[in-house]
Amino acid sequence: HPLALATGAEEEIIIPDHTLYGVYPPKIAEDEIKPVNESGEIVLSRVVVPQTIVVHDGVPSNASAKNYYVPYRDYIKNVASSEIYATWPQSTIVANVLAIMSFTLNRVYTEWYRNQGYDFTITSSTAFDHKWIFGRNIYESISVVVDDIFDSYLSRPGVKQPILTQYCDGRRVTCPGWMTQWGSCDLGERGYSPIEILRYFYGDSIYINNAEQIAGIPASWPGYDLTIGTSGDKVRQLQEQLDAISGIYTAIPGVVPDGIYGNATAQAVREF
C-alpha cells in the first residue's frame, strides 16, 4: 500500500505474507539463557524497556539491508500482527505478546548483535528473530494488549536476563520445548489463562516480570568515557544514533559513522 512521506510524495510498500501462511525459514534454535562473559561486557546492568529498537531488515550478514529505528511498542505491535492472528482469544494474544517481548528484551539486555560487531538490536529474519514488516498495518486487539503490558517479560528463578522465549507455528514446523502458536490458540479457546498457556509450553518455572523503562537505545558502558580522540565500535554506535536523530532534529548536525570521535561528533553531542 502507498505510504505518505514527509516530502508529500508516496512510496509503494509491498506487504509480504503473514508468517502463519507465508513461506519463511524456521527459527534456528538457540539457548534460552545466554552465557555472560567473565568481563561482564556482554550485558546491560539491568533489564530495561528501550524507547527505540534498531531493526535490521534482513539476515545479520546482509550489510545492504536497511536499519530502521522503531519505537519499542510499535515494534512489538508490528511483530505480533505479523506472527499471530488478531481474532485469537485474548489470553492467547497476551501469551504470545509476552513471549515476543521477552525474546526482544533478551536481545536488548545481552546486546546480542552489538557484541558480534553489528550496529542493530534485532533482525526481521524469522531464522534469527521474529518477523517485522516495514509499513504494515497493526490490529487493534493486539495494540491494546501491547499498550497494557509493554513493560513485562518472562523470567525464571535465579536468572536475571529475560528468557529468550522461542516459538514456532506448530503445524508446518514443530519445536519441542517452545510455544507453538496454533497450540496457544487452542489452549486459549479452552479457557487457559496467559500464564497457564506459557507454562504449558515453557514449564512451570516461567513467570511474568516487569522491567524499568528507559529513554533512547540502551547500551552498556564500554569502561571508558567517549571523548575527542576515542575510536571503536562504541563511538560508531553513538555516531549512527546521532546521525539518525539529526534527520528529525535538524539542529543536530549529521555525522559520518567512521568510529572516530572528532570535532564533528563532539559538536553533534553538544547540540543533542
Which residue ranges define each predicted feature?
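Conserved, single-site charged/polar hotspot
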Residues: H1-F272
